[in-house]
């Protein structure tokens, strides 16, 4: 069994901040499963399938990245993949407070799984999918915030 991590998120859409964490995780872990979750409290712009495909395109040069969707408990997905680590990115203290709740619950559900927090690079500390969608919705440029494929997909969604 290798050194496997799961990097979960809604990724609606994937940003360069997300990719920073995914790519840095790929240097540390033998395999990283990017797990696209459908967050019932959010109304997604892209379908789960579209989000998976956009991440696949953005990570196509990284052979140890696998992109899948999952509906259910994250710890169940991690166990299914034989992952012992959940990889999460942190931007600010508010992210930590939110993540701490999820981490604590995951420990209750499966004590064998650890959470690995990685600080986002400063250049992405303000970046979120919500901000990207808001800027794109009003015809603002998201160049330098998302991969080219996502930039094109956003234009298509809002102008299509």
Swiss-Prot record:
Any one Gene Ontology BP term: coenzyme A biosynthetic process
Residues given in the record as substrate binding sites: 10, 42, 74, 88
Top-level lineage group: Bacteria
UniProt keywords, alphabetically: ATP-binding, Coenzyme A biosynthesis, Cytoplasm, Magnesium, Nucleotide-binding, Nucleotidyltransferase, Transferase
Subcellular location: Cytoplasm
GO molecular function: ATP binding; pantetheine-phosphate adenylyltransferase activity
Site (Transition state stabilizer): 18
InterPro entries named among the record's database cross-references: Cyt_trans-like, PPAT, Rossmann-like_a/b/a_fold
Keyword Transferase: yes
Catalysed conversion reaction: (R)-4'-phosphopantetheine + ATP + H(+) = 3'-dephospho-CoA + diphosphate
Stored Pfam families: CTP_transf_like
Subunit-structure text: Homohexamer.
Matches recorded under NCBIfam families: coaD_prev_kdtB, cyt_tran_rel
Protein role: Reversibly transfers an adenylyl group from ATP to 4'-phosphopantetheine, yielding dephospho-CoA (dPCoA) and pyrophosphate.
Family named by the database record: Belongs to the bacterial CoaD family.
Name of the protein in its database record: Phosphopantetheine adenylyltransferase
Organism: Bacillus pumilus (strain SAFR-032)
Source taxonomy: Bacteria, Bacillati, Bacillota, Bacilli, Bacillales
